[in-house]
Structure formats: structure tokens, C-alpha cells
């Protein structure tokens, strides 16, 4: 079996489980750092392991454009290419392609788009997205979907839902026919990647429910809720998640894509979400914004110039155990590359520790 979801304990709707994947086990609820271009920005892989990141994300769109999925396949797949022995989830590329707006053209077959790097023309279909992700060799592959923009009227959300469902079926058929082509070594004999379906439907609860129920009929090993954190208010995000979760199987992992702040991921985990990812901890770190037990800290603020306290007195991460706010502020103002490294290490540690505390809370 290439995916085994072992449910250990529940506390209300919250679930404590272990997700067994070809490249290791993942304790859920889990936060997944985003490694867009085969790199979690500013953090080397050995330090990701030291933070106890169990699974990271790779971005299909970016890796397809550079360095290319066939090159990565020929070098033994994404795990070997980036020297990451633990689990990897790749997105389908759909979100990035649909974010290109004027640079894309959508048809029933797929999406024609121009590269943001050099303007060259490319085409992504459900089948091509599967080919790219299988070549990358991720543990979890995402179905190619149409991400609905916000705001979108009901007719647009309905059209997007129907496209997503047709593309999910095409993704599944092509994936099932080619999943054994993953570039893994003989020690993974009999194991393959796993394909998750993605629920769309805009901000309409009934459309979300319908999409979830129709995806469940396709029998994916896991399900994601996509199209959130696209500009809608937090209350609406929460409402859509709460309305969608009951229509997804209790015995399979549930993944909410692209969320959120630390208090949000903790809230969603308590609602019954098993997996989450977000660029926020890494992106904010590069701009000097730190997440702490006392709230957000803009380390560039002048008031930290002589502050000898660690970034967070309640945090035991490798940064808080060694460096002061004054030093981190100095690195930012001097534009030292080390600033991004230390800030990112702390933020990721804070996010991962937030999920660890939620897991312990469910177990208690």
C-alpha cells in the first residue's frame, strides 16, 4: 500500500493520525513548508530535518519551467535531486497557471499559458500535469483543477466546479495508467505516488458540498479543499471549510491548501483538517516579520535595536536559543543574507510547534 491513514484519536471533530507514505510517516495534523523551486527559501535541507519537518511541498509549475521535470526524472526524481529523504507533496500547477491572468487561455483540454520567465508558450492539461508530477516522483500528487477567483458569481463558480470534476476524472485515469513510471529506486518496489482530488465551488457552500460528494465517488486516497485564501474574509474561509469537511470521508486525509496564519492553522486543525501549507512563514520572514507567542513582531522596528531578548521567550527553537532581537534587527537593516535564514528558521519552527501542540492537545 502506498498510503495508509491510521486514525489514533479524535477530540470533537479534530483528528490525530499518522499518514504512512512511500518516503516516510507524517504525524497529523501537519503543517507543510513550501519548497517552491525544490527549496524552502533560505533553509537548507539538513536544518529542515532538524526542525522536524515531515513533509514539504514542491511546485509543479515552477519545476516544469526550471530546471524541467525530465531533467529531474533523469537525476532520480525530486527527492534525490534536492537531497530530501522525507515525504513530498506537489501541487498540480493549476493555481499558478490561473494566477497568470492575461498570460493564459483556458479550453476544455487545458490551459495555454506563457512563462513568466521568458514569455515562451506552454500548455498544461490534466494529463500533462500528471506526467510532470510523476516525473518529479512526489509521494502525493494533486489533480489538475481550475482555481476559482474571488469574487466569482454563482455561474462562474458552477462552471469552474464542472471543469474541475471533468479534469479530476481525466487526472485519475491518466495517473492510474502511468503512476508506476515514478523515478524511485528498487527499494520502493510495489509503491507508487498517491493522487488527491481537489474540491472547488467558489464561496458557495452547496456547490462545495456537491463537488466534494462527486469527487468522493471517484474514490481518491485523499482530498483537498482548494480555492481558499484568495482574498475572501477569514470568516468565509472558516465557513467553507466547516461546510465541506462533513462531506469528505472520515477515514482519508483532508488537506486545506494555502492557509494561513498560525492561529488559523490551529483552528482548522481543531475543525478536523489534517494537512495545511502556506508560504506565509517563509515570505514574512524575508520581510522581517516574525510570528511569536505574543503575536507578530516586525523585527525591523527601531525599538528592538538594543533588545537582548530572544525573538520569543516561549520558543525553544535554534534561533531563540542563541540570538537576540537586536542581532536579528541588525541583520535586516544591514541586508545580510543571514537575516532571511534565521527569521525563516524561527517562523517555520513556530508553525511546526503550533501543530505539535495541537496534536498533543488532541491526544490529551
Where are these regions (language model features)?
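Structural signal for hydrophobic packing residues in well-ordered secondary-structure cores
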Residues: 137, 168, 172-175, 179, ...
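Non-catalytic, usually N-terminal nucleic-acid engagement modules in DNA/RNA processing proteins
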Residues: 1-189, 302-305
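Glycine-rich phosphate/ribose-binding loops and adjacent secondary-structure elements
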Residues: 165, 178, 182, 194-311
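C-terminal helical cap(s) of enzyme catalytic domains, especially alpha/beta-barrels
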Residues: 69-75, 285-299, 352-355, 364
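Glycine- and acidic
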Residues: 149-153, 158, 222-228, 337-340
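C-terminal extensions of enzymes
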Residues: 1-18, 26-30, 42, 145-151, ...
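Short, electropositive alpha-helical surface patch
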Residues: 154-169, 173-174, 207-218, 339, ...
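Hydrophobic alpha-helical packing residues
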Residues: 24, 164-171, 215, 244, ...
